[in-house]
């Protein structure tokens, strides 16, 4: 089962400018803390759905041998500009992950897992990660919750108007299916002298899952897992907007 390869094509060039409020520094500090708690201070770390390389580049600066994986060639091009040459960037579908060896850890931030809109897609990804993860390795990922989609996004239209780029984000959330659909319309300046802007549109779909369903699926795939409120060690509440899963591959 494959993901949609068309997402983040027109968005890649402007993603970092429009998403400059994403708290990557806080997420990175949390991820680094979890890695070190699990005695992973060096070696190979795989960044799934790495996008433009915001987390990838930070982990590389920490001294890890980082592999960044994303479905979008355009996002990987942006990541190449941001990451040192030592970082290996691969265009792959997470559901069909294929590596030459194992890694000490896998990470996936900024709701990359929410793009897997069927449980079977998540199962395939979890099984692949388990296969390529070292014994005693750790799989760290976040997911947005149903509460976030329903109460923070909902059926809103969000606009962001900058000097050289503008965004219209039309959002629609279906509580019954857990599917969150959004249409992005981007106007990006292509000629400053003539004030010419190029319009592109992208359609994205994410899905919210009950946290317990994810925990059970991780266990079915062989992991021992915990789930926390984002950037804490607290148990998620009914109003948690983003949860972090910490999944271990333990010897049988």
Residue ranges with predicted function:
Residues 123-135:
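A short glycine-rich, Lys/Arg-flanked "PGG" loop and its adjoining helix->strand segment in the class I
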Residues 207-252:
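C-terminal lobe and adjacent flexible extensions of AdoMet/dcAdoMet transferase-like proteins
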Residues 140-215:
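SAM-dependent methyltransferase
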Residues 46, 53-96:
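Class I SAM-dependent methyltransferase SAM/SAH-binding core
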């Amino acid at each position: 089962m494959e993901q949609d390869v068309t997402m983040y094509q027109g968005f890649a060039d402007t993603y970092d400018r429009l998403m400059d409020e994403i708290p990557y520094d806080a997420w990175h500090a949390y991820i680094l803390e979890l890695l070190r708690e699990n005695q992973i201070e060096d070696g190979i770390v795989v960044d799934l759905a790495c996008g433009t390389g915001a987390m990838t580049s930070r982990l590389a600066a920490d001294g890890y041998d980082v592999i960044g994986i994303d479905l979008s060639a355009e996002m990987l091009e942006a990541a190449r500009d941001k990451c040192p040459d030592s970082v290996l960037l691969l265009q792959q579908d997470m559901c069909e992950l294929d590596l030459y060896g194992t890694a000490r850890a896998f990470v996936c931030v900024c709701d990359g897992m929410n793009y897997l809109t069927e449980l079977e897609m998540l199962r395939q990804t979890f099984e692949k990660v388990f296969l390529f993860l070292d014994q005693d390795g750790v799989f760290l990922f976040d997911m947005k919750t149903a509460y976030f989609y329903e109460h923070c996004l909902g059926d809103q239209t969000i606009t962001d108007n900058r000097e050289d780029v503008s965004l219209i984000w039309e959002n629609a959330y279906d509580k019954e299916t857990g599917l969150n659909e959004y249409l992005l319309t981007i106007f990006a300046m292509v000629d400053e002298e003539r004030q010419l802007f190029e319009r592109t549109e992208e359609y994205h779909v994410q899905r919210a899952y009950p946290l317990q369903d994810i925990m059970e699926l991780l266990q079915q795939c062989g992991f021992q897992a915990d789930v926390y409120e984002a950037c804490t060690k607290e148990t998620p509440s009914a109003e948690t907007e983003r949860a972090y899963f910490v999944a271990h591959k333990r010897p049988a």
